Design a protein with these regions (language model features):
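Sec-dependent bacterial lipoprotein signal peptides
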Residues: 1-54
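Extracellular low-complexity Ser/Thr/Asn/Gly-rich intrinsically disordered segments
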Residues: 6, 285-288, 311
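Residue-level detector of bioactive/disordered segments in secreted/extracellular proteins
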Residues: 19-22, 41, 58, 263, ...
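Short stretches within intrinsically disordered, low-complexity N-terminal or propeptide regions
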Residues: 34, 39, 53, 62, ...
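Extracellular beta-sheet/turn segments enriched in Thr/Pro/Gly and aliphatic residues
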Residues: 153-192, 196-200, 292-321
Length: 321
């Protein structure tokens, strides 16, 4: 039978024998160690293949349009310098807190600052638009900014009378900016009742012995930003007694005593809401006697003077100015 070879078969056979011969020759010359050295790059390529494929994945951030050829626009928030003046009328300030609220919308808190002393003039960068600026001085406690992030909450902020100090009274005030400027006038909550004079008109030169004075029905707290209509929800029954320096005899005495309370401007003709009153106590011929002086409506930060005249154990008169 005639052997028929297909075209190209001789060429494949020659290549096969050539490859086998080369492989046998390499194996003879270099041995098994040379074969492992040749395979090592293949193994390394297989190990690096997942990392190379991962580096080819697209980024999650969309690319800029190459046709644009420009950087993305930068959003710039405009700001203005707001001039704030703070006045305390010479009262001592050991700490000043400033709160800047937006005047419109939700009236949200925009900025808050704290200073160790009075800052009479400040230039503060704010967002454009009218602002409500609140100043509080000599606060006995630190503020919770989260609780005061709306102006409505600031309007309800109250301080307790027991935490106030006449030597460094709590001060507060607010103002609305006009053309990026405002002036905040800080005012105290405390009202002062000064016993200006005590007179003894009794016959027989009886003395008013061991005299002392105090206030009763004191408001327990007050809102720091309120200007009018102070209606206390809770009262303190009585303040501490303050003794007069001397017994009161023939000559009138000016004790120079000032008693303090929070405001209560309830009109005198309104029933059911007690107002503070001054209580004067002394001993007359061995008998303890008490005299009451109802106080007029007390506005925020006011000062009243009381002149008291004792005519006998059950008789007295007074003048308030």
């Amino acid at each position: 039978m005639e052997n028929v070879s297909k075209p190209g078969s001789r060429q494949r056979s020659s290549l096969h024998y050539l490859f086998c011969g080369l492989f046998r020759r390499r194996s003879t010359l270099r041995g098994a160690g040379s074969f492992l050295a040749q395979c090592l790059p293949v193994f390394l390529s297989l190990l690096l293949l997942p990392a190379l494929l991962g580096s080819c994945r697209r980024d999650a951030v969309p690319d800029a349009d190459p046709a644009d050829g420009q950087d993305p626009p930068v959003v710039v928030v405009d700001s203005v310098l707001t001039q704030i003046r703070v006045q305390a009328d010479g009262r001592p300030v050991r700490r000043l807190d400033l709160f800047i609220y937006e005047a419109d919308g939700l009236r949200a808190l925009e900025k808050q600052y704290a200073f160790d002393e009075l800052q009479e003039e400040l230039n503060i960068p704010t967002l454009p638009g009218e602002k409500l600026v609140v100043g509080i001085a000599n606060s006995p406690k630190r503020f919770n900014s989260k609780a005061l992030e709306r102006y409505d909450a600031m309007e309800q902020l109250s301080f307790n009378f027991a935490d106030d100090d006449p030597a460094q009274p709590i001060l507060g005030g607010f103002a609305l900016t006009r053309r990026e400027a405002c002036e905040v006038q800080l005012q105290p909550l405390l009202c002062g009742i000064r016993l200006a004079r005590v007179s003894n008109t009794m016959d027989g030169y009886e003395l008013l012995e061991n005299p002392r004075v105090r206030l009763r029905d004191l408001p327990n707290s007050a809102e720091i930003l309120r200007l009018l209509e102070f209606r206390p929800a809770e009262l303190i029954d009585a303040g501490a007694w303050t003794p007069l320096p001397y017994d009161v005899g023939f000559f009138s005495q000016d004790p120079g005593i000032t008693l303090w309370c929070y405001p209560n401007d309830t009109p005198e003709d309104v029933l059911g809401v007690p107002r503070p009153y001054l209580e004067f106590e002394c001993s007359i011929r061995g008998t303890n006697c008490s005299f009451e002086v109802p106080l007029p409506p007390l506005s925020r930060g006011c000062m009243k003077e009381v002149e008291l005249t004792i005519d006998g154990p059950g008789s007295h008169s007074y003048n308030i100015r």
